[in-house]
Amino acid sequence: MKIIITGEPGVGKTTLVKKIVERLGKRAIGFWTEEVRDPETKKRTGFRIITTEGKKKIFSSKFFTSKKLVGSYGVNVQYFEELAIPILERAYREAKKDRRKVIIIDEIGKMELFSKKFRDLVRQIMHDPNVNVVATIPIRDVHPLVKEIRRLPGAVLIELTPENRDVILEDILSLLER
């Protein structure tokens, strides 16, 4: 089962993913990304990756000098890959052996897609009919892979909105039990 969650920025995709991870417990393996905010000004300064193992690393920041930019955020692809690739490889191995495992990928977005290793691994995972995945994608097709995932045969595409975000969790958990 492939469950693809999309929606406008700030609608609650990552919050929903974290609730799914909490409910699935050890069945969930993967990562999510979240904003990094200045503790004093509360302004967003970057993004960090957090794995289901509890590892964290800032991979995108207004303070990074990089040729890879998304708006004013420099993206350090190596920092992202250091956490994302090992956890996704482990998740994929375990999910192939145990159908109850769920691979978590939040998000398949512009910053993450700078990594060719990530693109290749995500494509392999998403096209494997024998593994369960919960992934998030931007509302807009920011990359050909996002477009490909949005049109994946058999995948369930859910657009998260302010109207459904508080009631969709149980539906997603039910889909994963099939």
From Swiss-Prot:
Name the Gene Ontology molecular function terms of this record: ATP binding; ATP hydrolysis activity
Matching InterPro entries, A to Z?
A: AAA+_ATPase, Nuc-triphosphatase_THEP1, P-loop_NTPase
What EC identifiers does the entry list? 3.6.1.15
Q: How is temperature linked to this protein's activity?
A: Optimum temperature is 70-80 degrees Celsius.
Give the residues the record marks as binding ATP.
Answer: 7-14, 102-109
Which reactions are catalysed by this chain?
A: a ribonucleoside 5'-triphosphate + H2O = a ribonucleoside 5'-diphosphate + phosphate + H(+)
**Which keywords are on file for this protein?**
ATP-binding, Hydrolase, Nucleotide-binding
HAMAP family reported in the protein's UniProt record: NTPase_1 (MF_00796)
Function as written in the Swiss-Prot or TrEMBL entry: Has nucleotide phosphatase activity towards ATP, GTP, CTP, TTP and UTP. May hydrolyze nucleoside diphosphates with lower efficiency. Does not have kinase activity.
- Give the protein name, as stated in the record: Nucleoside-triphosphatase THEP1
Originating organism: Aquifex aeolicus (strain VF5)
